[in-house]
């Protein structure tokens, strides 16, 4: 605990540990680590929780409402009769943190930067798929369209056409009017524009510090680039109510932007600190050194948090998470000298890369996960059951799909069938990973290990906690054989779960090398159903996909606990919006 208190002092928020944080300061201790502060690159809750406070989009959520949007950097918009053009009228008098005025050119630059770079491990696909029709970066799409043996001339021609689509996707009608031109109608486009990737960046500031020039001249140099190496990774170019002071990789310090168009917020300083150990976070909460902390489960809330004085547990039966948690299987593990698959062979000391391509193994592991224990013991009955990777309250969810619960006899039956009996005969060794500090995922990993190893002494599972950034990196590199992970919605439409989890080009499915033409065909077709009278058909397709997923089992959905927020009891203005990465905007809170 001492090292964290010393860090608070070193960051200049106060000179010593006190009974309460200053009245104008908000201190939040989270379990995860920020990956990137670039709106195009950031694609995890810890990163987006910062981005959504230092940057802004054209519209934003109206506090705790998922269906009501309020004008932010735009004041109004219209949609063409054919649903292909969205025109926004921008707010005048908005200044970036640099002092530069915001105009249409900044909005255009920000969206086109998404379309130009399209990092493979980012959310840029959210916009590319509807504005240009492409869900991957230009070179990836060129190889997909032309094949690996395409000539340079063929690739250049494809890239020229791709650039023309980027140019046509966003246009400035005048200094304060911007239009987005869709490749095809999409009912979720407005919802997509609320995602942090659509945040408006100070184009002059960005270009001056070495980012993409905003022109055709250097766009090819930026295709698919990892933006963690660029200036905006650690520097702020936003309009938000807070501006970045410092990010050292583990701690974010921000301060109120006095030139904010919406008026300076009450809270003047913010510290978001990544603290892996839950016990350390809880002690900081108890002492008053933190205003909010991450707590992993309802079991901890009931056993420890509710015993603390001066602490408030915010919860409401109406709160429903916009997320899903599953155990992923990798159908073809990647990476040389991969430490998670042992020998790389089915010899008792490892697993082959395509180990989980056998449905019998996936079923066996599913029957080794004690979902009742997760729901009843870890969540103490505060949660929701999941039959598929879609929130139960969202359209297209099928509550009638069966749930595989703990059944070691069935697990043994499927283990004996796996790989023609060789798995049972030879045994295996693999490693399950989770992000360090996340006791829920640790519990899931330990359950699977204990139950699998109890079936056959030749079955061996190691468990390896990884730092959050390393965990994400390993998952994106497709090097993990099996791992538990959650997904929070980017935009409020069921497509944002169905496509990532079940489509071969989905941001999650491609990490596990899951490819099934029948899934792809249905999901692609569902995306063409954009008219109001077609929505019932679209949601029936999603239910069918859920039933197919039960049979194919690309992942194991498991219960998700009911949301709660833990703060000191003097924090006011707290609310829960499941579409925000950290539940509420900093500008809305204060202290009594």
Predicted regions and their residues:
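Surface-exposed ligand-recognition segments of extracellular binding domains, strongest
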Residues: 65-95, 119-216, 573
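Boundary at the C-terminal end of the N-terminal hydrophobic targeting segment
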Residues: 17-20
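Positively charged n-region of N-terminal signal peptides that target proteins for export
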Residues: 1-4
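Bacterial N-terminal signal peptides
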Residues: 8-15
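N-terminal lobe/hinge region of extracytoplasmic solute-binding protein
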Residues: 29-81, 237-238
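Gly/Pro-rich hinge or "lid" segments in bacterial periplasmic/extracellular proteins
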Residues: 62-63, 157, 161-167, 171, ...
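Extracytoplasmic/periplasmic ligand-capture domains
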Residues: 63, 91-121, 156, 181, ...
């Amino acid at each position: 605990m001492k090292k964290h208190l010393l860090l608070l002092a070193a960051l200049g928020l106060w000179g010593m540990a006190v009974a309460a944080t200053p009245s104008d300061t908000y201190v939040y201790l989270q379990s995860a680590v920020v990956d990137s502060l670039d709106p195009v690159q950031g694609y995890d809750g810890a990163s987006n929780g910062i981005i959504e406070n230092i940057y802004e989009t054209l519209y934003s959520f109206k506090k705790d409402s998922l269906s009501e949007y309020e004008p932010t950097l735009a004041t109004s918009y219209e949609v063409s009769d054919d649903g292909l053009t969205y025109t926004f009228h921008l707010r005048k008098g908005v200044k970036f943190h640099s002092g530069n005025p915001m105009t249409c050119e900044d909005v255009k630059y920000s969206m086109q930067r998404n379309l130009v770079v399209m990092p493979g491990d980012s959310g840029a696909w959210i916009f590319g798929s509807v504005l240009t029709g492409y869900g991957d970066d230009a070179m990836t799409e060129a190889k997909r369209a032309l094949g690996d043996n395409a000539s340079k001339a063929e690739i250049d021609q494809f890239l020229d056409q791709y650039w023309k689509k980027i140019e046509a996707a966003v246009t400035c009608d005048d200094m304060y009017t911007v239009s987005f031109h869709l490749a095809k109608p999409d009912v979720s486009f407005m919802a997509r524009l609320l995602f942090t990737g659509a945040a408006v960046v100070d184009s002059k500031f960005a270009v001056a510090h070495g980012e993409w020039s905003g022109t055709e001249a250097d766009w090819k140099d930026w295709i698919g680039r990892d933006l963690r190496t660029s200036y905006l990774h650690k520097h702020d170019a936003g309009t938000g109510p807070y501006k970045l002071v410092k990010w050292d990789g583990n701690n974010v310090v921000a301060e109120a932007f006095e030139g904010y168009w919406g008026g300076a917020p009450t809270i003047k300083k913010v510290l978001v600190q990544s603290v892996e150990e839950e016990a350390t976070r809880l002690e900081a909460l108890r002492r008053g050194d933190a205003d909010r902390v991450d707590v992993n489960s309802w079991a901890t809330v009931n056993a420890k948090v509710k015993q603390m004085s001066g602490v408030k547990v915010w919860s409401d039966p109406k709160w429903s998470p916009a997320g899903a948690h599953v155990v992923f299987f990798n159908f073809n593990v990647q990476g040389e000298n991969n430490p998670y698959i042992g020998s790389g062979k089915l010899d008792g000391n490892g697993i082959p890369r395509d180990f989980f391509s056998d449905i019998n193994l996936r079923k066996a592991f599913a029957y080794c996960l004690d979902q009742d224990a997760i729901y009843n013991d870890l969540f103490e009955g505060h949660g929701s059951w999941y039959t598929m990777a879609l929130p139960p309250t969202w359209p297209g969810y099928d509550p009638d799909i069966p749930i595989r619960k703990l059944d070691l006899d069935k697990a043994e039956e499927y283990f004996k069938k796996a790989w023609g009996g060789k798995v049972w005969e030879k045994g295996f060794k693999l490693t399950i990973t989770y992000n360090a500090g996340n006791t829920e995922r640790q519990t899931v990993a330990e359950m699977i290990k204990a139950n699998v190893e109890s079936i056959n002494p030749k079955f061996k599972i190691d468990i390896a906690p990884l730092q959050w950034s390393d965990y994400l990196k390993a998952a994106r590199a497709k090097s993990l054989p099996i791992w538990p992970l959650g997904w929070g919605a980017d935009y409020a439409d069921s497509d944002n779960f169905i496509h990532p989890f079940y489509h071969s080009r989905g941001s999650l499915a491609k990490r596990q090398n899951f490819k099934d033409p029948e899934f792809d065909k249905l999901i692609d077709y569902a995306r063409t159903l954009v008219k109001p009278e077609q929505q019932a058909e679209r949601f029936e397709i999603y239910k069918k996909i859920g039933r197919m997923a039960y049979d194919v089992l690309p992942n194991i959905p498991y219960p998700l606990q009911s949301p709660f927020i833990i703060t000191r009891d003097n924090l006011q203005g707290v609310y829960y919006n499941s579409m925000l990465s950290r539940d509420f905007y900093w500008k809305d809170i204060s202290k009594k």
